[in-house]
Amino acid sequence: MVLEDEAGSDSIEDLHSNGSLRDFRRTGVVSPGRMRAIDKNAMALGVSGSQLMESAGKSLAGVVMEYAPEKVLILCGSGNNGGDGFVAARYLQNVCDVDLLYYSFGDMTPDAEANLRTLLYCDVSVHRIRCPGDLIAAESLFSKADVIVDAMLGTGARKGLVEPYLSMVRLADSVGAVKISADIPTEGFNADRTIGFHLPKSPESEFVDIGIPLDAEIYTGPGDLTMVPAKKSGSHKGAGGKVLIIGGGPYQGAPYLAALSALRGGADIVRVATPCMMHYPDLIVSPLSGGIISGEHTEELISLGESSDCVVCGCGLGNESHDVIREIAPYFRKVVFDADALNYPLPFGNETIITPHSGEFKRISGSLPPKDLYARGMSVRNFAGSADGRLTVLLKGATDVISDGGSVRFNRTGSPAMTKGGTGDVLAGLTGALFSRMSAFDAACISAWINGAAGEKAAGLYQNGLLASDIIDKIPEIMNMEI
């Protein structure tokens, strides 16, 4: 949440919406990474992992009961997918004979382990697979089962099946039982039905509600941090993203705030192209002649931008350089436009994020965003959607609104102390750092949450004396928090 705004613009949203925010829930297949983020956001809102597992397992058992089976075989791994199977076994114990095979190659997740222990007190035959002989001894269970449930490997599984899962899948596929997969089929398992939890993870999947709060999905949260790509062992310099900041002239500090924020946001290399020369040992500065960015800098800026993963334009730029920005923007793969770059006609790169406040949104769209949050979300989505898939909008306000023309999400982190000048530059640089290594919509959502959360931390120390640079210093703490 960033409250930096123009005089006379509308920055206070009315959270009592005339429409339903449910309309902004996504539909269709969700990626495993996005689903993990939603799960973590639900936990941050007070729904425990054990509650989610209980709901998932109970729903899975309900699907199995539709077949009125006499014998059910449940195949489990050691992760949370296996935990869903343990819960399902408990709910099925009073309606049919239940056998459960599980393989644990290391530590189980705590929730899965707790539900496995509970089965000691249930009418469920539990068989642990420790070696090939254990599976051979259990082979007859496959042919006797009316329904076989696959709860072996979930959304976090790696490609390439290993033993004993390989043999468990082979045995299951060799018999005529109805086969049901929990959340996502284990590789090679020929499921008759796949029951996704909360949202489908594959096109052929059904899905059931497991009680995840609406806000865990349509609002940003700490779970979104799980989507930020981790640096791989052995990565070379620059693998974390190369960001170019183009700005400065009338306002000398703005591009440097954006650049330092990009570094704290994880970018490996940050270069500042500006007429305002300041010395920072962590930054590469490409000084531009004159007092403002002008047409004589066009070729140099295009060259610098083409060698960057993401370009951030507008911080401290002034109004006299807009034509230059419009001319160079199409040469850039990914661009974040902020502040003085947000004028009509709007410049576009190949992929573009803009970070306007309400006044800037009016400048480029012709109208102020509505106060009502639902209408505000629709307004931002419609504007983003008018750009043929090239634009993601991060509208700053008491509640930030983010849309790529299809999806819409909201962010409510932040502090009233963030009305200080420069906070928008910090957000722009952070957005550029994330955008350099992930999709536009995810980068915009996550940067809004991080920036607001860092602002809350800094405001706790400095209250109304907060500086934009104080937010920058808190970014790593937020990005590295335990989720």
Language model features by range: what are they?
Residues P132-S143, A339-F348:
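Short amphipathic alpha-helices and their capping/turn segments at secondary-structure boundaries
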Residues C76, Y102, L120-D123, M152-G156:
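Generic hydrophobic/packing signal
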Residues S181, F337-A339:
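Short beta-strand elements of ligand-binding domains
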Residues V2-S104, T109, E113, V147, ...:
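Small-residue (G/A/S/T)-rich helix-start motifs and N-terminal tracts that mark the onset
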Residues L119-L141, E296-L304, L317:
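A structured beta-alpha segment of the ubiquitous adenosine-cofactor-binding alpha/beta core
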Residues E139, D146-V147, A151-T220:
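Internal gly/pro-rich beta-alpha loop/helix module
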Residues G133, E163-S167, D323, A375-M378:
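Short, conserved clusters of charged catalytic residues that mark active-site
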